């Protein structure tokens, strides 16, 4: 009886010690993970009066003209929100990433849609070798025609997509900011694909963005289709997100 009791006590003590060890290990891991997190947030604004966006005549494609009858579409070269935030600005890390972070490809597969005779989104950013889908949500054919720089790592392609056909997969082989995209059937359709290495984002209607990066020293670059690129250096400390705001001058 005593032998069984002794065995029970020893086993219980060992399990208790193991439990405390696992708890300590877990807490240590959580603390390390929390300390290793960082990030860069910011807002991009336009100083001055934004240029007038021209209305788009879609009368040659009745389906699209009807779809936008109550809310006519304009160009999207400079879109400013109610608080001055600049939409459709690509933000990325141009310096400071180590080789592992720069080569990491997100598992997410974004979609470049053709809807209402517009490219949705107007501007998309993605990583080198990150796959994306091209879809057609309209009841008529479209033609997607990206125009990367000649003799660069990316190759021009031109593909029609009839209504009801499934999305097709594409990928870009090298960095390029940014690749213009047009539709040969509907000449008013324009957009951009920015291809980078590492974390990237496109600003929302408030001009806001977030880049998830580990602690370190970085150069953050913003690119806008009308106003071009701006850069600034930031330092991200462990557990303390950094801020990188940009302001473009209207012209």
What does each model-identified segment do?
Residues 2, 19-27:
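Domain-scale selection of a single, long terminal region
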Residues 24-251:
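Extracytoplasmic copper-binding redox domains, predominantly the cupredoxin/blue-copper superfamily
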């Amino acid at each position: 009886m005593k032998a069984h009791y002794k065995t029970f006590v020893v086993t219980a003590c060992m399990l208790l010690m193991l439990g405390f060890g696992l708890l300590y290990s877990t807490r240590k891991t959580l603390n390390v993970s929390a300390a290793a997190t960082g990030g860069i947030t910011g807002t991009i604004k336009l100083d001055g009066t934004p240029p007038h966006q021209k209305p788009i005549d879609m009368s040659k494609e009745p389906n699209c003209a009807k779809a936008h009858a109550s809310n006519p579409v304009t160009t999207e070269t400079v879109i400013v929100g109610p608080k001055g935030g600049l939409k459709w600005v690509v933000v990325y890390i141009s310096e400071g990433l180590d080789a592992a972070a720069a080569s990491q490809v997100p598992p997410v597969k974004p979609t470049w849609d053709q809807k209402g005779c517009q490219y949705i989104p107007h501007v998309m950013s993605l990583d080198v070798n990150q796959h994306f889908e091209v879809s057609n949500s309209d009841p008529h054919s479209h033609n997607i025609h990206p125009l990367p720089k000649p003799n660069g790592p990316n190759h021009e392609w031109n593909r029609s997509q009839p209504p009801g056909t499934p999305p097709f997969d594409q990928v870009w082989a090298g960095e390029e900011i940014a690749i213009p995209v047009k539709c040969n059937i509907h000449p008013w359709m324009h957009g951009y694909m920015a291809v980078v290495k590492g974390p990237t984002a496109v600003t929302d209607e408030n001009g806001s963005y977030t880049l998830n990066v580990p602690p370190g020293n970085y150069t953050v670059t913003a690119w806008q289709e009308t106003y071009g690129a701006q850069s600034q250096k930031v330092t991200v400390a462990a557990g303390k997100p950094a801020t990188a705001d940009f302001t473009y001058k209207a012209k």
